[in-house]
Amino acid sequence: METATLVAISISGLLVSFTGYALYTAFGQPSQKLRDPFEEHGD
């Protein structure tokens, strides 16, 4: 394959992986450990 094709596929794969990890962190199992500063601030 050409170098440009490999670079494009690699960057696309990294972007998809990062997006998947971010969604898992935000909505998956680790989201239980995230703190909510608005909920902590009692008015």
From Swiss-Prot:
Name of the protein this chain belongs to: Protein PsbN
UniProt gene name: psbN
Topology with respect to the bilayer: Single-pass membrane protein
Subcellular location: Plastid, Chloroplast thylakoid membrane
TM region(s), chain numbering: 5-27
Lineage top rank: taxon: Eukaryota
Alphabetized UniProt keyword annotations: Chloroplast, Membrane, Plastid, Thylakoid, Transmembrane, Transmembrane helix
Organism field: Phalaenopsis aphrodite subsp. formosana
GO biological process, one term: photosynthesis
InterPro entries reported in the protein's UniProt record: PSII_PsbN
One GO location term (cellular component): chloroplast thylakoid membrane
UniProt key word Plastid: yes
Protein family (similarity comment): Belongs to the PsbN family.
Role according to the record: May play a role in photosystem I and II biogenesis.
